[in-house]
Each structure stands twice: as C-alpha cells, then as structure tokens.
Regions:
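Intrinsically disordered, low-structural-confidence terminal and linker regions
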Residues: 1-19
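Conserved N-terminal entry element of GNAT/NAT acetyltransferase domains
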Residues: 16-66
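Short amphipathic alpha-helix that is part of the acyltransferase structural core
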Residues: 45-96, 106-110, 115-116, 308
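Short, solvent-exposed loop/turn elements at beta->coil junctions and helix N-caps
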Residues: 91-98, 211-215
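Short, His- and charge-rich active-site/binding loops that engage polyanionic ligands
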Residues: 108-142
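Acyl-donor binding region in acyl/amide transferases
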Residues: 129-232
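Charge-rich, low-complexity intrinsically disordered segments
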Residues: 219-292
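C-terminal non-catalytic accessory extensions
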Residues: 281-309
C-alpha cells in the first residue's frame, strides 16, 4: 500500500533534467582521473574498512518467484527515478524482455523479508544484450573474440541500506554465479563515467569504447566496460592479497581476493545445480499485463525468445 501511494504521488513526474545530456561532477571526475590505480584501491579499501560489513540477517540469492522479480524491478525503477534518468510509471516497474529470458538471473538482497537490493546477470541470447542499443559495435567485437558473454545490469539499493556493503555482496553472488555456474568468460557493463574509476581500479574492468548518451535513460552518459573473468582471480590475488588492503565482514578479516574468489558466506545462497529460474508463459503474460504491455506490441523475435510464439 505504501509503495502504491508512493507510485501515485510520483506518477508522471518528469526526470530531473541535468544540464546538457547529463551532469558530471567535473571536479570529482577530473580528480579521480589523476589518482594512480594503486592509490585509488588503497583509499577505497580504507573507506570500507572503517566499519565491518554487517550482513547478519541478510540473504543474497536469485529471485524465486514472480513477486520477488517484480519487487526488484520496482526498486530499480524507484532508484532510476530518484537519479533523474527515468520517470515513475503507473505499475512502478518497466517491462524488459531481458529480465524474463532463460539466461537471465536476477539477484536480490533480502532483509526482514523485504527486498532492499538487486542486480541482474543477463547472458547473451538471440535478443543480444541491453547495452547493444548504445554500444553495439563494442559488443560485436567482444562476440567476435569468442567466449560466453553476459551483461551486469539494473543495480539498485534501497535508500536506507546504502553504505552497508549490500552492492559488494550482490556482486559477490553474481561473480561466483557467472564464473562457477554459468561459464561466463567476459562480463560487460555500461556505467556512468562517474563510476568508471571504481570499476576500472577496484574491480579491474577495462574500457571497450567511448562514452555515449543513453537515450532511453534521459540521455544519461554511458561508458562500456569489460571484465575477463578467466583472468580476474589471478589479478585480484596479485592486487589484493596483502595485509594493508584488508577489511572485515561480520568481524572476520578478509581482502578482495579472498572475498570474491575463496571464502564462502552462508548469507549467499546459490542453487547447487546452477540452473536459472525459468518463467512459464502464464507468468510472462501476467507480468506483461501488470506492466501494461500487450503481446501484440512485441516483435516476433521477442515473442519467440519468451516462448510466446
């Protein structure tokens, strides 16, 4: 009920228009550009090491029902509207065929039976990848290089849970799932240039193209990046396996190599078989109806991908 009231209050609200195609905090971005990667990593770890990541009572796992998927998508829509790159729609969520594909896994962070964070792993398919709409040539080049591709998308965290390690734990679950269960070799992501330094210097993503405006997201700027998952563990070990780069998770000391590649966390619950939740035709149609989308508005290719044709 509270969510419905919030949606109706904000329904139709135009995104905040940021000067030009987007607002970049030039001073911050310019400063980060000149920070050496090793120093950037030390500063980042120092910041998160101030407090132990408190994940007690949290659960991080793939969605298990259509209700959970839709709650995650509502959280994404709220987050995008708050950032000014989308409007709040009547349903509180926007339809995307990518989230219903057999190769897509949507992860959620759950606390007190509420979904407070989400991120999705979208594997390459007959529909391609979402970032191809803006960075088509870059994705084609990655395909030509061979290997299994997937895109990281729709990261969102509820307002009261930012700064508590929720994104790191979601990424932990998603990385392990992609590497060990789905055989993904390269992760692609499109981020705002403001976040580029974090992904390059901390998670070792590499730029694969130029910054472009993302038309569907109020012309927000989009930087395409790629991470070679096959080499990531060795890179993380070399960069992070040292005492000066440690931090705590629930009072236990760790570092990013151990955190992402070795330690197991009971709060992260991944299906042992590596199977992805498949949505049947009735669930797909139900979700479309809730989003105000009719089957006749979908292309034949999308209908085939969703097993509706």
């Amino acid at each position: 009920m509270l969510h419905s009231q919030r949606v109706m209050t904000n329904f139709g609200r135009k995104p905040r228009i940021h000067s030009g195609v987007d607002v970049i905090r030039h001073s911050m971005v310019s400063l980060e550009r000149y920070i050496p990667p090793t120093l950037y990593r030390r500063l980042f770890i120092k910041r998160i090491a101030r407090h132990s990541l408190a994940i007690e009572g949290f659960e991080f796992r793939p969605v298990q029902s259509l209700f959970e998927l839709e709650e995650a998508l509502r959280l994404v829509n709220d987050s995008y509207a708050r950032r000014g790159i989308s409007t709040v729609c009547r349903a509180g969520m926007r339809f995307s065929a990518f989230h219903l594909l057999p190769g897509t896994t949507t992860f959620v962070a759950i606390k007190d039976q509420q979904i407070v964070g989400t991120v999705s792993l979208i594997e390459d398919s007959m529909l391609g990848l979402p970032l191809e709409e803006v960075h088509g040539n870059e994705v084609v080049m990655q395909r030509l290089a061979g290997g299994r591709l997937a895109e990281v998308g729709t990261l969102a965290v509820a307002a009261g849970y930012r700064g508590k390690g929720v994104p790191l734990m979601l990424y932990n679950a998603m990385f392990r799932w992609a590497m060990h269960f789905r055989g993904v070799q390269r992760l692609l992501i499109a981020v705002h240039p403001r976040a580029g330094a974090f992904y390059r210097n901390v998670l070792f993503f590499s730029p694969m193209g130029r910054v472009q405006p993302y038309t569907k997201l109020n012309n927000a700027l989009s930087l395409p990046l790629c991470l070679d998952l096959g080499n990531a563990p060795a890179i993380f070990q070399q960069a992070y396996q040292r005492p000066t780069l440690g931090f705590s998770v629930e009072g236990q000391r760790t570092h990013f190599f151990d955190f992402f590649c070795r330690s197991d966390y009971a709060h992260i619950r991944l299906p042992a078989t590596g199977s992805v939740r498949r949505w049947d035709a009735q669930e797909v149609l139900t979700h479309m109806a809730r989003c105000g989308v009719h089957g006749r508005n979908l292309s034949p290719r999308v209908q085939r991908a969703l097993a509706l044709a």
